[in-house]
């Protein structure tokens, strides 16, 4: 089987993972103690388990996942929470002191003490796989552990498991809802370090998700659990085709093949529909056509940027539930007639479809309504460069005064790393500009002939 190991780093990574595993268990009919529910036992055997779960001799399912954090609080909550019986106790690794929102602590001083222990556990989980497909790494850009330790882990995974794909789910610091002053530093340093190690990075921006929760679910003040449950639906949709059967299945490597035209341009924009509250569910038609169109509206996207100003390079539409290929093709045909959706001219068709017949599950007493079909769209668009430019300008403001830099240098980092990381990000922004501009030049060439 094609197994996938999830690695959850730092507070954001661990808490998103909690929501994801809660959802996977519901989808596969696994109880919080790791054993199957009675109705699941009665149904046909499910072979999709083994992608994310390993089975022990006595019929218990254990997630192939590792939690790592430099401070114990978040992981202690998992150790004592409702799902404490599900996870392998040795796969919960926490340190004694945290990274204090400092990339250098996560990457150099504090992180260095924990990394070998984490990699040892990764190796054990990997040895237990018959055909390891790759890693999903969950972390945030803004925190110290997520950025520093997350980057260190990615570097070391590249050394130990060079050819295996590594997909990142990263929480991008939101413009309005910042949790620390040094987020721009951490984000740019971690992006610079992981750029060559990640094959595909799905960014999620807290503010965009706050807005979706407020607007679509009517939550006045969403908390992290509300946000994480929404993120979990997205992660579940992306991984559904690896775990269930469908008519058009998508494999981990297929994501990169279809979404990443150049190795550095690997930050797809994620959109998910329908996000509707239980109260409104009965009044929505929720047709394949409607869902597909709503994915192209900025309101349903997981990062604040406007794709109408950018160009699409590639788009993956992952449907799940009651969707027949015919409907999906019809929806795409309609999309192609829309003038607002512009593709770069060197990538004419650009739509990849995936259909998984397992309908989306909802957490009981959650905010999302139960729907019979959903779609998750992953699109590589040049508009996501807007996210980088906002971050870069904040970085420049602080770095021009060398504010807070002594905390990083004090942990053994060199100041040159800041300017190096900033230059790398500037190069990334230029790469995006060039990709969008290529299509403009192409038009002139045609005119000459």
UniProtKB/Swiss-Prot annotation:
Cofactor dependency: Mg(2+)
One Gene Ontology molecular-function label: structural constituent of cytoskeleton
SMART domains referenced in this protein's UniProt entry, alphabetically: Tubulin, Tubulin_C
Top EC group: hydrolase
Alphabetical keyword list: Cytoplasm, Cytoskeleton, GTP-binding, Hydrolase, Magnesium, Metal-binding, Microtubule, Nucleotide-binding
EC id: 3.6.5.-
Cell location: Cytoplasm, Cytoskeleton
One biological process term in Gene Ontology: nuclear division
Entry's Gene Ontology cellular component terms: cytoplasm; microtubule; nucleus; spindle
Binding sites annotated in the UniProt record for Mg(2+): 71
Binding-site residues, GTP: 11, 71, 140, 144-145, 179, 206, 228
Active site: 254
Site for Involved in polymerization, residues: 449
Catalytic reaction list: GTP + H2O = GDP + phosphate + H(+)
Superkingdom of source: Eukaryota
Role this protein plays: Tubulin is the major constituent of microtubules, a cylinder consisting of laterally associated linear protofilaments composed of alpha- and beta-tubulin heterodimers. Microtubules grow by the addition of GTP-tubulin dimers to the microtubule end, where a stabilizing cap forms. Below the cap, tubulin dimers are in GDP-bound state, owing to GTPase activity of alpha-tubulin.
UniProt family annotation: Belongs to the tubulin family.
Complexes and interactors: Dimer of alpha and beta chains. A typical microtubule is a hollow water-filled tube with an outer diameter of 25 nm and an inner diameter of 15 nM. Alpha-beta heterodimers associate head-to-tail to form protofilaments running lengthwise along the microtubule wall with the beta-tubulin subunit facing the microtubule plus end conferring a structural polarity. Microtubules usually have 13 protofilaments but different protofilament numbers can be found in some organisms and specialized cells.
Name this polypeptide is given: Tubulin alpha-B chain
Organism: Neurospora crassa (strain ATCC 24698 / 74-OR23-1A / CBS 708.71 / DSM 1257 / FGSC 987)
Lineage: Eukaryota, Fungi, Dikarya, Ascomycota, Pezizomycotina
Gene: tba-2
């Amino acid at each position: 089987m094609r197994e996938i190991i999830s690695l959850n780093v730092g507070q954001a990574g661990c808490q998103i993972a909690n929501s994801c595993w809660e959802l996977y268990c519901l989808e596969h009919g696994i109880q919080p103690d790791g054993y199957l529910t009675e109705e699941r036992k009665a149904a046909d055997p499910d072979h999709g388990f083994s992608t994310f779960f390993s089975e022990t001799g006595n019929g218990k399912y254990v997630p192939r996942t590792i939690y790592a954090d430099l401070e114990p609080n978040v992981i202690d909550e998992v150790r004592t929470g409702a799902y404490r019986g599900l996870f392998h106790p040795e796969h919960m690794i926490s340190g004694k002191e945290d990274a204090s929102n400092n990339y250098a602590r996560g990457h150099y001083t504090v992180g260095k003490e924990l990394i070998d222990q984490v990699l040892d556990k990764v190796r054990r989980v990997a040895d237990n796989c018959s055909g390891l497909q790759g890693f999903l790494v969950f972390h945030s850009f803004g925190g110290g552990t997520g950025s520093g330790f997350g980057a260190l882990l990615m570097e070391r995974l590249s050394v130990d498991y060079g050819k295996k794909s590594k997909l990142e789910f990263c929480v991008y610091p939101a413009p309005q809802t910042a949790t620390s002053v040094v987020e721009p530093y951490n984000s740019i340093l971690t992006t610079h370090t992981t750029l060559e190690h990640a094959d595909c990075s799905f960014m999620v921006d807290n503010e965009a998700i706050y807005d979706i929760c407020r607007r679509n679910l009517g939550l006045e003040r969403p908390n992290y659990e509300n946000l994480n449950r929404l993120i979990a639906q997205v992660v579940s949709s992306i991984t559904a085709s690896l775990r269930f059967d469908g008519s058009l299945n998508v494999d981990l490597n297929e994501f990169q093949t279809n979404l990443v035209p150049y190795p550095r341009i690997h930050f797809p924009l994620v959109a998910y529909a329908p996000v509707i509250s239980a109260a409104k569910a009965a009044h929505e038609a929720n047709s394949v056509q409607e869902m597909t169109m709503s994915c192209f509206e900025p309101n349903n996207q997981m990062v604040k940027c406007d794709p109408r100003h950018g160009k699409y390079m590639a788009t993956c539409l992952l449907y799940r539930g009651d969707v027949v290929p015919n409907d999906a093709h019809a929806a795409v045909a309609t999309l192609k007639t829309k003038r607002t959706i512009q593709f770069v001219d060197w990538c004419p068709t650009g739509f990849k479809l995936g259909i998984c017949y397992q309908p989306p599950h909802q957490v009981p007493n959650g905010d999302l309504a139960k729907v019979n079909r959903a779609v998750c769209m992953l699109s590589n668009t040049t508009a996501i460069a807007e996210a980088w430019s906002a971050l870069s300008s904040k970085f420049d403001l602080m770095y021009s005064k060398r504010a807070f830099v002594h905390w990083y240098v004090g942990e053994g980092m060199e100041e040159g790393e800041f300017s190096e990381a900033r230059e790398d990000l500037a190069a990334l922004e230029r790469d995006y500009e060039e990709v969008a501009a290529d299509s403009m030049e192409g038009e002139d060439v045609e005119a000459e002939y």
